[in-house]
Amino acid sequence: MPYLYRIAYDGTLFYGFTGHSRSLEPALKRVFGEILGRGSRTDPGVSAVANTVMVSQKLPIALVNSKLPRGVWAWAIAEVPQSFNPRRAKFRHYLYVAPHWGEDLGSMHEAAEVLAGTHDFASFIQRRGEKISTIATVMEIKVELRGDLIYMHFVGRGFKNKMIRKLAWAILAAGRGIFNIRDIRELLERPRPGVVPSAPAEGLVLLNIEYDVDFQIDYTALRSAYVYFLSKYRHAVAHAAALKAVGETLATWEQ
């Protein structure tokens, strides 16, 4: 029987999940051998709490993590049927975080409301060359202000290439007055591929892929990942504050 592992990783350390020698998947293959399936092919710079990989052999999580590179953890395992497809999830939950620079939250909420639902998202997809359906359903988009940060939650069964980053850019653009709600409706009703840029990858995190599967959690591995990300967060906050101080000091020389 195949096995499904939940994987957390720091996306800034890898060139995406797959498709490159510096991607995460080659490191996973060195541990597991063949990868039978994966839950999400995250972009370079995108981190994950609970991506998944399906493999043919059951290995102890402690052994797996001893062989994985820094910034990657397997932290749960489940036995699944031979016919299981990790792409067919109940839903995927992504979070996009951006600094709040005065964006109008009301306009952002309105944009999120328009973009949620079933639409032709051709304006919000970057095609890889293959012919794909551009119709998709976004179950929920939630926008909230937490301190000086904007949190945007995206929930759906599946998302196309660059789709969340483009949706995030459009919602932020609505808050900045770059787009109005009529513009966003027109992008859905009369698609214009290539018009909407992608928001930076580093703000995006895959929080969860939900399945009807009973995972066994390794709490030692989970805590190891938690300590790593908490430590990195503390350093990032200090670095950001230092950069702000540099900018403020430079500005005093202009007076």
UniProtKB/Swiss-Prot annotation:
- Domain of life of the organism encoding this protein: Archaea
Which EC class, in a word? isomerase
Can the keyword ATP-binding be found in this entry's annotation?
no
Alphabetical GO biological process terms:
tRNA pseudouridine synthesis
Q: Does the keyword tRNA processing apply?
A: yes
Q: Which UniProt key words apply to this protein?
A: Isomerase, tRNA processing
What EC number(s) would the UniProt record show?
5.4.99.12
Q: What does this protein do?
A: Formation of pseudouridine at positions 38, 39 and 40 in the anticodon stem and loop of transfer RNAs.
Q: What is this protein called?
A: tRNA pseudouridine synthase A
Organism of origin is Pyrobaculum islandicum (strain DSM 4184 / JCM 9189 / GEO3)
- The UniProt gene name for this protein comes to truA
